[in-house]
Every structure is written in structure tokens, then in C-alpha cells.
């Protein structure tokens, strides 16, 4: 029995192509280019084919159990078959959902590392303080997933931070962190507030994918590169060498700076990564402006001006406005336990894409 014939036939066709590609890979005299294309297709399709095999096995088990119930006269065997049915049938819906997710068009940046920029917005000192608080939550979240955080630039203010930028390296980082772009609002009583009044402040977060040189080519003639002495902690060495680097992209006026590395070469390489990410962001913003009919149900636009989440300290509540998700455990979230929020955003985004794709 096939529960979803359209899905089944689509997967069957994909499996046949997958098998054909594996056979072609064994062909003698295959060009390096074609071999690379085949290996890429096989890598992308393997998770779908493996899941489809599980799906087919479950369908066959259900079919066998149903036939056994109809033909068997031994009550004990019938009961065992009915038990198997009760265990296997719920798996069909689960596998079909997982297969639909695997069939969705992939964001080409999902497997990339990210560059994150955090800035205070409205709210003065409280805003600057919350930049540090949310950064700590991101750092713990990254640590919990085995990701590595590398500081790029830190600007301290009198009571917090005027700017923090950092890179996160790991598996599929952008697929999760991209949902953090936007305006984060915090509501709490400042330490200096004598009357216990709740103040509201905001910070902005931008999450950019780290791009390879071949993905976004920058002409050296378009760059103005300055070096200067790094500031901040680091002892005498920092003041003796011009290890900090500032790169300006002349055509756009976009500039980046990096001083956290140990050498000028390291800072220059990092600054170029930052610049590629910023130029990508500019291009994406232009694309969004040119598209008149953005999909209405998407999980936010990713624009910095969009208020995405509120952190209410007096009520220990965090609300993500894009999916109307409220959790009454802000203290836990700020310890880096962001998975429940981010996973919910991913699930919502997948559901919307499925509806649009009519899968």
C-alpha cells in the first residue's frame, strides 16, 4: 500500500537516477569534471535515498502484517501482526515529513560558517549591556554544538559593548544562526533604577555567511588597505607593531577592521572574509528591494530593522514574534539553551516552504 503516491513516485524516480549515477561512476575514462559532478549529486541525494529505503521497508512491513491478519487464523499470530501495525503505521507520517523536508530546495549558504555583528540600538547603557549578555548566550549555544567562536572586533563602552563581531566555525552554522538577524528587544529593571521601573532597550544582530573567494570575487584595485596599531589588552607587543587592518571597498564605501589576530597577515585574511560577507549582505538587500512580492509566511525577512524577539526579565519570558512562540524560561535561554527557539523557527520555515512547493 502506498500512502502518498505522488511523493512515492517522485522518490522512486530519484532513486533510479541515484543508481544510474553510481553505475556511471564506474565507467572508465570518466572526465574529472564529470566525476566531480556525479560525486556532488550522489552526496546531495544519499540522505534522501537512505530515508526512502527506510520508508519502503516500513510500507512493506505494514503490507505484510495486513495480509497476515486477513489470512491467518491463529489469534496469537494475528495479535503479533496487529502489534506490528500499531508500531509501524505512525512511522509512515514521520518518514513522509522527513522526506518532504529533505526534498525542499536548500539554502546554498546553510552549511557555511558565519560572521555575527552585534550593536546597541535604543536604550543607552542597558542596550550596551545586553549586547554582552546575548553574546554570552550565543557563545554557550555554539559551545554546546561543538562550534568554535573566534573574536573579530570588540569595542567596549563604559557599561557594556559598543560593538562585537565574531565568527562561528562548525557544521551547518548558518542554517541555525541565520534566524538571529534582526532587532532584539530587552525589558528589565536597570541596576541604576531606584524606583524599580522596567526599561525597554534594543540591540541589532546581523548574521552573514562566510563566503569563499571564488564565490565573491573582489578586485584588488577596488580596495584601500590601512594598517594601524591595535588597541586593547595584549601587552607591549600590540603597541609596537601595526598588526590591525582596515580595508575599504572604494566602489561601495563599505569598510571593515580587524585587530584580534596575532599578526597583520591573519588580520588581513579575516578582514577580507568580513568584507566579502558585507558585500554579500549589500547584494542580498538590493535583491530583496527588487522583489515586489516576498513570500508572506516566511520566518522574517532577516532585515536588521525587523523586531524579532523580546526578552522580558521581570516575567522570565522570551517571545519570538515571527512564530508567536513564548517560553517562560528566559533564565535558561540566556544560559545558551537556544535550541527550542531556533528549532521551532526551522520547523516553521520548513512547513511554509512545503506549502509553497505543494509537496
Swiss-Prot record:
Pfam families associated with the record: PCRF (PF03462), RF-1 (PF00472)
Domain of life of the organism encoding this protein: Bacteria
InterPro entries noted in UniProt: PCRF, Pep_chain_release_fac_I, Pep_chain_release_fac_I_sf, Prokaryotic/Mito_RF, RF-1
Residues recorded with modification N5-methylglutamine: 236
Compartments, as annotated in UniProt: Cytoplasm
GO cellular component, one term: cytoplasm
Post-translational modification remark: Methylated by PrmC. Methylation increases the termination efficiency of RF1.
Keywords per UniProt: Cytoplasm, Methylation, Protein biosynthesis
Gene3D superfamilies named among the record's database cross-references: 3.30.160.20, 3.30.70.1660, 6.10.140.1950
GO molecular function: translation release factor activity, codon specific
Function in brief: Peptide chain release factor 1 directs the termination of translation in response to the peptide chain termination codons UAG and UAA.
Protein family (similarity comment): Belongs to the prokaryotic/mitochondrial release factor family.
Name recorded for this polypeptide: Peptide chain release factor 1
